[in-house]
Amino acid sequence: MIRHLLLVLFLLVSVLPSTARERSLSEIRQAACSVLQGQSNRVQVQEDALQIALQKEMLTVVTHHGCFAVIANDDAFDAVVGYAEGAFSMENSSLVWFLNTVNESMADDIKKGNGHRTSIVPDASKFKSSIAPLLTTTWNQKEPYYNFCPVADNSTPYPTGCLATALSQIMKYHSYPTHGIGEKQYSFRPSEGVGEILYANFGETTYEWSKMLNDYKKDQYSDEEANAVATIMLHCGVAVEMNYTPTGSGAYSSEALYGLIHFFGYNQNIGLVHREYYSLEQWMNLVYTELNAARPIYYAGYDASQGGHAFVIDGYNATGLVHVNWGWGPNGGNGYYDITLLNPRGYQFSEGQNMLLGIDLPTTEVEYESHIVSDYPLSVSQIGKMLSVSVGETIWNLNGNAWEGELAVVLEGEGQTYLLSKGTVSKTAYQYNVLSKTNPAIGGVLTLPTGIADGEYRLYVGAKCSLDKRWQLVRRSEEQVNSYQVTIADGAVKDVVADTDDTWESTTTAIKAVITKGTNAPSRYFDLQGREVNGSTKGLIIRRQGDEVKKVLVK
């Protein structure tokens, strides 16, 4: 029942002073009053009726009649960090992880004197202004969801695990598959008590999606309905070899990726992406792109004290707050939160954040992208007419599974793609160094291709396997140099400029193949992904006429 919030939230995101200032308790209450009033049509929210549920250094949780708001204590940040219907509870470990991580990251931002930070609003030229929550389920980890999970010494089943709950809700959204693929067993060894073999026959099981309720209220469901949801919960646990414990069960995102594809038959091109190798803008673009394709996102975070946390992002509002289904039931804090605060500039709280993109049916077209990264910046310098390229000491495979393909030093521009240096990568395990499997080695002092046209180019290290349609940027840690802009004049290098931007995309996918000699050649137009479009297409497009390539802004 979250309504009428857009105007309220836009008013809250007003122009703030250039210097950070702590909000007074009255200002915090006023901000909370405004946002909570937008959530409740039952009663008029009175400021003096608000309750302070939690106060931390950088944020305050304010509650009122079964709703709560998270307000930033310092006006260096937008007032509203999050808001939700449902009672606030510190038992929700994923929500607690979010609050603790945001609190620490905001404090570090203030300590470093960073300026005013705002959430990243979806670009109206690319995305819908808002998307209502995609999930209708409000499942949790207890009864009846855990009915088929292994039993602890006290005869109570272990919790399903936040990962299994997240995956199960996403699969319920798709109501797929009817039957799984194959079977699996693994040895479960609890920290206390006797271990056991856990088994699931995915291929012989019929998943009764129509019998799974959006919410299971005590004494309001049948055994058949309970068994339907308990089955998918257990099977998700077996698929990822869940480590069940009485206080919370866990597994890895890479295992979730493998299980979705190999045991449940989901799209082969699901991608695992890691926050620390994306700029904040590009990370949010990934989120908005996925949700505009009507695909809920599996999202995971990690902290040293409590381990991993998995939940579902399934919508967003006009101010850039995403809707989170925490997997803690209808009163588990599901609502809108500012995930951009999880990673302050230059401070790696993002290490441990990842998400799965492209969770969809196998018949849906999802473009595959290799995820190969480095913790070292790219280094390029000019040596006369040549380029000296250092690709970094290590380059890691973070695809979530084994990878083989090619690495190359790519020079791209003027409608052409040149490979200045290329090596073949033999099969490399997940989280292993692909450079050690690359032959020949790439980089060093490199010469320009003969006859290269003068103009502006981008040089980067690219990765490509048999599934990629284009060279994929080997991503560097956020704010590290990942490419260079290279100016070519008279067939020689004139200038090289380092670039940390990662929002650009290859423009030569289709353009390269349509070169026509002669100045009277007809014009052809392409979008920034290299797909041919009509010349009247609005936005930034690329025009090729003969050998001439220009970017054109059509209004």
Model-derived features: positions:
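Short beta-strand elements
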Residues: 467-507
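Short, aromatic- and glycine-rich surface loops/edge beta-strands on solvent-exposed regions
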Residues: 454-467, 482, 540-545
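Active-site-adjacent substructure of cysteine-protease-like catalytic cores
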Residues: 43-65, 258, 262-325, 333
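Sec-dependent N-terminal signal peptides
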Residues: 4-14
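Active-site-adjacent structural segments surrounding the nucleophilic cysteine of cysteine proteases
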Residues: 77-249
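Residue-level detector of functionally pivotal "anchor" positions at catalytic/ligand-binding pockets or at interdomain
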Residues: 350-373, 505-529
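Cys-His-centered catalytic/binding microenvironment captured across papain-like cysteine peptidases
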Residues: 22-55, 69-70, 75-138, 292, ...
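C-terminal outer-membrane/trafficking sorting elements
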Residues: 16, 508-555
